[in-house]
């Protein structure tokens, strides 16, 4: 999956609603700040691994130097995680919860030069099992 596909699915209602199987960063990132250094180091390693994967995406890697690709990937990842956290903080049926996801997803995909496919809903294939 390329970066656009990852963010299309990550910043979605299905991911937001899948609290039990969703991203550890979004679910526990706030709690990690109060944990021992070993836990925070594990979170850091997970973030680094995800950044490595995103930076390898051709859309990001051809945008300049590896450092520039990393900066872009980090900015998008932080925006995506923040979108999930803030959307989850709202009631599930809140218009604001959905707006947060829509605005952030569009901004991230726009920065990648991508838009959702007309026939692909961001929640496709992400129904909790």
Which role fits each region the language model picked out?
Residues 47-57:
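Active-site oxyanion/phosphate-handling segment shared across diverse enzymes
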Residues 123-129:
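Long, low-complexity, intrinsically disordered segments
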Residues 31-32:
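Well-ordered alpha-helical scaffold segments within catalytic/enzyme domains
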Residues 1-22:
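Hydrophobic alpha-helical connector segments
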Residues 37-44, 58-123:
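Hydrophobic/aromatic-rich alpha-helical bundle segments in the mid-to-C-terminal region
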């Amino acid at each position: 999956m390329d970066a656009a596909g990852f963010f299309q699915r990550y910043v979605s209602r299905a991911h937001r609603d899948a609290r039990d199987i969703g991203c550890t960063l979004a679910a526990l990132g706030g709690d990690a700040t109060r944990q021992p250094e070993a836990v925070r180091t594990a979170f850091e390693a997970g973030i680094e691994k995800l950044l490595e994967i995103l930076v390898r995406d051709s859309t990001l890697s051809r945008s300049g130097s590896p450092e520039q690709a990393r900066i872009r990937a980090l900015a998008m990842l932080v925006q995506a995680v923040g979108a999930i956290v803030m959307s989850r903080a709202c009631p599930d049926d809140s218009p604001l919860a959905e707006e947060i996801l829509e605005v952030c997803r569009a901004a991230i995909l726009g920065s990648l030069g991508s838009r959702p496919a007309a026939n692909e809903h961001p929640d496709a294939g992400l129904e909790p099992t």
